[in-house]
Curated annotation (Swiss-Prot):
Entry-linked Gene3D superfamilies: PurM-like C-terminal domain (3.90.650.10), PurM-like, N-terminal domain (3.30.1330.10)
Compartment(s) where it occurs, according to its Swiss-Prot or TrEMBL record: Cytoplasm
Biological pathway: Purine metabolism; IMP biosynthesis via de novo pathway; 5-amino-1-(5-phospho-D-ribosyl)imidazole from N(2)-formyl-N(1)-(5-phospho-D-ribosyl)glycinamide: step 1/2
Role according to the record: Part of the phosphoribosylformylglycinamidine synthase complex involved in the purines biosynthetic pathway. Catalyzes the ATP-dependent conversion of formylglycinamide ribonucleotide (FGAR) and glutamine to yield formylglycinamidine ribonucleotide (FGAM) and glutamate. The FGAM synthase complex is composed of three subunits. PurQ produces an ammonia molecule by converting glutamine to glutamate. PurL transfers the ammonia molecule to FGAR to form FGAM in an ATP-dependent manner.
Binding site for Mg(2+) 1: E98, N542
Quaternary structure and partners: Monomer. Part of the FGAM synthase complex composed of 1 PurL, 1 PurQ and 2 PurS subunits.
Protein name: Phosphoribosylformylglycinamidine synthase subunit PurL
Length: 739
């Protein structure tokens, strides 16, 4: 049991600093908000979590305003539990990504599992049925025993939660770098489907309407989890296990089904619904009231508790999982109680909506908190941080491009070594632990450019992906941010889809350090530039700052999650070559783009230099490839990313054990160049004339560089290796490194 301090003791001891409040913020609460009254223990705790970066985005809010968030396809953008995008037929796709980085270092299994649980609740709080999970993971060097343990437990946590709740984990990405050794990134994206009429909002309005607590009971787990996620790691951070929540996917499954039933069958009595996520009960309820311009009066005696003698501070700040808040029309309380009882879940009336604009809590007959509701939510402070260009950026800008030389005799060995690099090597050993087929909607499972799920009752499908190459952002945050969006769109296009919108997880260092804030705001400029050019507005997202360990920051890593629409399932395209005799086509020109590449990192052990990115060419090439796919001219498509052309060709040949015979006017090194905006396609010879005619109507560049063979040999200029040997290296590298 936590011992409450008196208001005077809080002021004198300054314990609020440990909870994340600054002296200035504490004085603002006391003098400006409470009119000179000292905040009590519960109130101080509530402000500490609600004014954390994790909850109020006080450092990043000005940056987020840069993003384009509207478009004809957008039904609901940032501000609700998740974004909503129209896909026609009175249907919409709902999606969002969340981070659970700090908890996943302290308790990797539970941190990753509850990250999945939280984002799933965000989706069904909108009224949507979750249909897919994707993850974007970053770890330290895999030759480190601690890293291997974290990789094993994080992937087990994601698999355990998703598999048990019955939602397929269909895609994602994994990368390794020294900067993540003490601060792994666990970003989870969830996608759902909904009929327009069932779309919900997280609001509490209508004086006298009831506030219901539904789901699991409240414990002491996760208290100050939001504050924990809003500061750097230090030497004692690994012991902060009380800030990590514990999940129960079977409870979440019941909660999901109960909430969907309320929304679909009792929508007329439901005013609003919201997940109890970061900052638990205080966050969900105060945000619902603030958005509606209401007040709330809550009786904490009614909060279901799984531990004894919990005090108001603990009940309000607990981040126990599998809990939701519902605002229900007055007079219909019993209907809600009866429905949740059917699922053996608590559904308890804990308060009511008021019109006084205050957030008032009672416990054992005593008022234990009384503050303006907007001061907890909408009126939380916003800071405009100083931005300063890091010294390394000017150094990279002034430097020459990195240009490796690879001899004919060395190119095959270089290729083999690249195949075994942890970031390039097959992640099959990870994604095979996930159930990617449950719900039976998965058409393209993990391993291709994007996952594809059919939309039942229509002829449509959804393509989805997560992407970010943080090395590019380290060299140039603006171009790197733009590339992250462009690569996500390339993956959607290569799967036959039209990109619709993005969600993001902005993983950066300490925003109070000018160089770190510059990385954040500059990356946002690049993301915005690509989103505008590619017509992919930002509809939801998450900010995770303070990703530093003992003062050392991670690489800037804005993970981009994207969903695209495939209008006709016949246009679904995968990356693998289909049959011998098909022509291999390279779309896009190749230049000497090695700065930040896998090749540079492998050969030199570092990344340096300046990068180029032509967004206009990217858009032209994407439009051309999508048109060729929808015209039925393409048998396979694969985007070029890490490792360049040689790796993309190999990955295209692997699935069906085919060979390739490629002659292309590139140097040995250029086979591994990472020039953006490129695709590898295969087409039937009988479609070549139609393909070339379509090319004349576009300004895209394209050339036939070879053909698919059945001899089991990968031959690219002077590079030659058997497909079987290459597959063995590619699929065996990660399992071997994990031993």
């Amino acid at each position: 049991m936590t011992l409450e301090m008196l208001p005077e003791q809080i002021q004198e001891s300054k314990i609020y600093r440990e909870w994340g409040l600054t002296d200035e913020e504490y004085l603002k609460i006391k003098d400006e908000i409470l009119g000179g009254r000292l905040p009590n223990f519960t109130e101080t705790g509530m402000y500490a979590v609600m004014w954390s970066e994790h909850c109020c985005y006080k450092n990043s809010k000005p940056v987020l305003k840069k993003f384009p968030t509207t478009g004809p396809q957008v039904l609901m953008g940032p501000g609700e539990g998740a974004g909503v995008v129209d896909i026609g037929d009175d249907l919409a796709v709902v999606f969002k990504a969340e981070s659970h980085n700090h908890p996943s270092y302290v308790e990797p299994y539970e941190g990753a599992a509850t990250g999945s649980g939280g984002i799933i609740r965000d989706i069904f709080s909108m009224g949507a049925r979750p249909i897919a999970i994707l993850d974007s993971l970053r770890f330290g060097p895999i030759d480190n025993g601690k890293t291997r343990h974290i990789v094993d437990q994080v992937t087990a946590g994601i698999a355990g939660y998703g598999n048990c709740i019955g939602i397929p984990t269909v895609g994602g990405e994994v990368a390794f770098d020294e900067s993540y050794a003490g601060n792994p990134l666990v970003n989870v994206m969830c996608v759902g489907l909904i009929e327009h009429k069932h779309i919900q909002k997280g609001q509490a309005k209508g004086v006298g309407n009831s506030i219901f607590y539904v789901g699991a009971k409240t414990g002491r787990d996760g208290i100050h989890g939001a504050s924990f996620a809003s500061k750097e790691f230090g030497s004692g951070s690994e012991t902060q296990r009380s800030a990590v929540q514990v999940g129960d996917p079977f409870m979440e499954k019941l909660l999901l089904e109960a909430c969907i039933e309320v929304i679909q069958n009792h929508g007329d009595i439901l005013v609003g619904i919201q997940d109890m996520g970061a900052a638990g009960l205080v966050s969900s309820t105060s945000e619902m009231a603030s958005k509606a311009g209401s007040g709330l009066r809550l009786n904490l005696d009614n909060v279901p508790q799984r531990e004894t003698e919990m005090i108001p501070y603990e009940m309000m700040l607990s981040e126990s999982q599998e809990r939701m808040v519902l605002c229900v029309k007055k007079g219909h309380e019993q209907e809600i109680i009866d429905l949740f009882k059917k699922y053996d879940l608590d559904a308890v009336n804990i308060g009511e909506v008021t019109d006084d604009g205050f957030y008032t809590l009672y416990h054992k007959g005593q008022m234990v908190a009384h503050v303006p509701v907007d001061s907890l939510a909408e009126d939380a402070p916003t800071y405009y941080r100083e931005a300063k260009v890091p010294e390394r950026i000017q150094k990279f800008t002034d430097s020459e491009k990195y240009l490796p030389e690879i001899t004919d005799s060395a190119v095959s060995e270089i290729f083999k070594k690249l195949l075994a690099q942890p970031t390039i090597a097959s992640k099959k050993s990870i994604y095979e632990t996930y159930d990617s087929r449950v719900m039976t909607n998965t058409v393209v499972a993990p391993g291709s450019d994007a996952a594809v799920l059919r939309v039942r009752g229509t002829n449509k499908a959804l393509a989805m992906t997560t992407d970010c190459n943080a090395r590019y952002l380290y060299l140039d945050p603006e171009k790197g941010g733009a590339i992250a969006v462009a690569e996500a769109a390339r993956n959607i296009v290569a799967s036959g889809g039209k990109p619709l919108a993005i969600t993001d997880c902005l993983n950066f260092g300490n925003p109070e350090k000018p160089e770190q804030f510059w990385e954040l705001t500059t990356a946002a400029d690049g993301i915005s530039r690509s989103c505008l050019a590619l017509d992919t507005p930002v509809i939801s997202g998450n900010v995770s700052l303070y990703n530093e360990t003992n003062g050392s920051a991670i690489l800037p890593t804005p993970m981009i999650g994207m969903v695209g629409l495939i209008e006709d399932v016949k246009n679904i395209t995968t990356q693998e070559f289909k049959k011998a005799g098909d022509l291999i086509v390279l779309v896009g020109q190749t230049f000497d783009d090695f700065s930040g590449s896998e090749l540079q990192k492998m050969l030199t052990g570092e990344i340096s230099g300046k990068i180029d990115f032509d967004l206009e060419t990217e858009k032209v090439n994407q439009d051309f490839v999508l048109k060729a796919i929808t015209d039925g001219l393409i048998n396979s498509a694969h985007d070029l990313s890490e490792g360049g052309l040689a790796i993309a060709l190999a990955e295209s040949a692997f699935a069906n054990g085919l060979g390739i015979d490629v002659e292309v006017d590139l140097s040995n090194a250029q086979l591994f160049s990472e020039t953006q905006g490129r695709f590898v396609l295969s087409i039937s010879p009988e479609n070549q004339a139609a393909f070339e005619k379509l090319l004349t109507e576009s300004s895209a560049s394209s050339e036939v560089i070879g053909k698919v063979t059945d001899n089991g040999i990968l031959k690219i200029n002077e590079l030659s290796i058997s497909t079987d040997e290459a597959v063995s290296i590619y699929e065996g590298a990660l399992p071997c490194l994990m031993k």
